[in-house]
């Protein structure tokens, strides 16, 4: 029996790009379904996603809540959670199919290599830092994608409904020895780093991560994370 992959994308006001994203996933030959988890868009994101062929669910704003809602409706044996501003580069299909076909990965999860669509030295330095973080601490973030069997996801209890650090919370439950780095690139938009800076944004992310590990509530962390932004 063929393995079915459900791609789950949390979105908010992505009407300008959602059609192309959905079509790319559906045309990949790997995704059996695409689920757009909308966090209350005030534009035409949801309607356009449906027209493009995606299933659409609505949820409270926040990637944790949105991805959890998407997973509840997924019919796939495997789930791929991935951010709307991330796309997987050529070669990911074979890598993903091999991972899903290996019975040893039934209770494991995979993530892809973090790559920015920026040719600057600062971008390359950040990519190396992310690779080190993943290798040393087993902490991939959501913009690297998370490939996990539906069974294992349910066993872990899924994404928590928290406004920040939902990806960290889940991968900590997966545990480092069950996380595998997949040899395919996840190309992510560098817009956030151009806006916030290649020093300030990673520093703020690291501060939030450290405070989270110290027990600070995500409801407070999200205020720190979004400070100074609209």
Segment roles from a protein language model:
Residues 4-6, 33, 169:
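Cell-envelope/extracellular polymer assembly enzymes that use nucleotide-activated donors
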Residues 8, 13-27:
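Short, well-formed alpha-helical segments that are part of the catalytic scaffolds
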Residues 16-20, 43-52, 91:
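Acidic helix N-cap motif at the loop->helix transition within catalytic regions
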Residues 38-46, 86:
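A conserved acidic beta->alpha catalytic loop
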Residues 79:
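Short aromatic/hydrophobic "clamp" motif used to bind/position activated sugar donors
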Residues 91-122:
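Conserved donor NDP-sugar-binding/catalytic core segment of glycosyltransferases
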Residues 172-230:
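Hydrophobic helical membrane-anchoring modules
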């Amino acid at each position: 029996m063929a393995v079915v992959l459900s791609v789950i994308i949390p979105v908010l006001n992505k009407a300008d790009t959602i059609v192309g994203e959905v079509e790319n996933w559906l045309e990949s030959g790997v995704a059996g379904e695409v689920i757009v988890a909308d966090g209350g868009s005030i534009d035409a994101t949801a309607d356009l996603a449906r027209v493009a062929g995606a299933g659409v669910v609505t949820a409270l704003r926040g990637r944790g809540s949105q991805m959890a809602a998407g997973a509840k409706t997924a019919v796939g044996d495997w789930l791929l959670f991935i951010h709307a501003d991330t796309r997987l580069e050529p070669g990911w299909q074979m890598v993903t199919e091999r991972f899903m076909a290996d019975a040893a990965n039934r209770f494991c999860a995979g993530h892809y290599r973090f790559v920015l669509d920026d040719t600057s030295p600062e971008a390359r330095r950040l990519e190396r830092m992310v690779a080190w973080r993943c290798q040393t601490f087993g902490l991939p973030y959501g913009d690297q994608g998370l490939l996990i069997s539906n069974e294992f996801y349910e066993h872990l209890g899924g994404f928590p409904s928290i406004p920040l650090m939902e990806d960290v919370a889940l991968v900590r439950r997966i545990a480092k020895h069950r996380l595998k780095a997949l040899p395919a690139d996840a190309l992510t938009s560098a817009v956030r780093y151009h806006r916030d800076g290649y020093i300030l944004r990673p520093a703020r992310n690291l501060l939030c991560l450290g405070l989270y590990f110290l027990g600070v509530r995500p409801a407070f962390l999200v205020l720190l994370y979004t400070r100074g932004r609209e």
